[in-house]
Design a protein with these regions (language model features):
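Conserved ABC ATPase signature
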Residues: 53-57
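Helix N-cap at the start of a conserved alpha-helix in ABC-type nucleotide-binding domains
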Residues: 89-91
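H-loop/switch region of ABC-family ATPase nucleotide-binding domains
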Residues: 114-115
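Conserved beta-strand-loop-alpha-helix hinge in the C-terminal portion
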Residues: 133-156
């Protein structure tokens, strides 16, 4: 995720408007752009962030803003690279619950890269183990207990398998 200086005056509304509208952010932002940004943030339960400075957001709040931006317009496929990095445990659960809600509401396919294997087993319905090529594909419990998984991460398997 991008880093914003705590003293940076750019608000979430400024950031959203700069990314979604052809409107210079140094001019007053018309109500239609404000309403659009608020509606997008509402998808991720982030309406209260609209006027906050980007530099004052927590990791989880920043992920919400970036997710709202990625959902404008709502895609068929959402690709997220390490979306839980910089997010605390409570924020992780909120973000995963929200992704599950969005997946259902918008019939989204979500591709999520992570090294957080606990997340995989709770959130994913399919896991792809990659190491320059597909090593294993299947349900989380199958992939995470496979010899390919253990070999990839140089882990030892217990007696009788994983």
């Amino acid at each position: 995720a991008p880093n914003f200086d705590r003293g940076d005056p750019v608000s979430v509304l400024d950031f959203f408007t700069a990314a979604t509208a052809k409107w210079p952010v140094w001019l007053p932002i018309p109500a239609k752009y404000r309403d659009r940004a608020a509606a997008c943030l509402a998808r991720v339960h982030g309406e209260d962030l609209l006027d906050r400075p980007m530099g004052g957001l927590s990791g989880g709040q920043l992920q919400r803003v970036l997710l709202a931006l990625a959902l404008e317009p709502v895609p068929h496929i959402l690709i997220l690279d390490e979306p839980l990095s910089g997010v605390d445990i409570e924020g992780e659960h909120q973000l995963l619950d929200m992704l599950d809600e969005l997946r259902t509401q918008y019939d989204l396919s979500i591709f999520l890269s992570t090294h957080d294997f606990a997340t995989l087993s709770q959130f994913a319905d399919k896991v792809i183990l990659l190491n320059r090529r597909v090593l294993k594909l299947g349900p989380p419990e199958e992939v995470l207990s496979s010899p390919e998984f253990y070999e990839t991460f140089h882990l030892r398997m217990g007696k009788g398998g994983a």
